[in-house]
Design a protein with these regions (language model features):
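Aromatic-lined carbohydrate-binding/catalytic grooves of carbohydrate-active enzymes
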Residues: 1-81, 85-91
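Short glycine/threonine-rich loop-to-helix capping motif typified by GTGT followed
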Residues: 93-96
Length: 231
């Protein structure tokens, strides 16, 4: 949900709602994304952004979206984009979406990583367009009580038969959050340490699906240690 319209909720037709939809807000970001990019670069952190290609008109604006992604890469060094909100409901939409992926990949010399969210809608998945990046496989939240580490590991294990594990993103959450939702469940995430959770998805691309500032000191130290081993 965003504020492009009075009531928010714009998930396609972005350019019709606001021609400068993907331009950084001039008051909130008077220098564009330069301060964020500079801060990240100074700490050796690669910058990534969420991006939703415009699905309206069977991806009529696919070239405009591709140019936006390339501009963000060239201007700010954003080399990772999570592509979300995609609706591939016709063959024409699929063809144009593939053209977007091809254009960004070719013109960046494969230096831009495209993470395709495949959690909803009709989208590319395990058997198509895998060469263009990685797959964001699932959404899980302790807020809703639907995150179970053993299920995440099982999904990774079963899908690895068809997709190289390193091409998929699998999540680990802060095990100390929302423990009351799981009560006495012996498989609750709160019964694991953070480094154990990281190790359970280490064969894939581990996704720290959390606010890092909310980690307890001990879990933060354990993650720091195991991430050092992973690197």
């Amino acid at each position: 949900v965003n504020s492009a319209r009075p009531l928010g909720g714009v998930w396609e037709g972005y350019y019709a709602a606001d021609a400068d939809f993907w331009t950084p807000h001039p008051e909130r970001f008077p220098r564009g994304l330069y301060p964020v990019a500079e801060h990240a670069a100074a700490r050796g952190v690669a910058l990534g952004l969420w991006f939703s290609p415009d699905s309206s008109g069977e991806f009529a604006n696919w070239r405009r979206d591709a140019e936006t992604l390339l501009r963000l890469w060239r201007t700010y060094g954003v080399a990772v984009f999570k592509l979300d909100g995609v609706k591939l409901r016709t063959p024409a939409a699929r063809a144009k979406y593939l053209s977007l992926l091809e254009m960004v990949t070719a013109q960046s010399g494969r230096r831009v990583m495209l993470q395709q969210d495949i959690t909803a809608e009709q989208r590319m998945g395990y058997l198509a367009a895998r060469e263009y990046g990685t797959l964001f496989v699932e959404n899980r939240y302790t807020d809703f009580g639907n995150y179970y580490p053993h299920r995440t590991l099982r999904n990774l294990w079963m899908l690895a038969r068809y997709v190289p594990a390193q091409r998929m993103l699998f999540e680990l959450l802060n095990p100390a959050r929302n423990t009351e939702r799981y009560r006495a469940d012996p498989l609750a995430p709160g019964r694991y340490t953070a480094d154990y959770l990281f190790a359970s998805v280490m064969a894939a691309q581990p996704l720290l699906w959390m606010e890092l500032s909310g980690l307890g000191r001990q879990d933060a130290a354990r993650l720091q240690q195991i991430i050092g081993v992973y690197r």
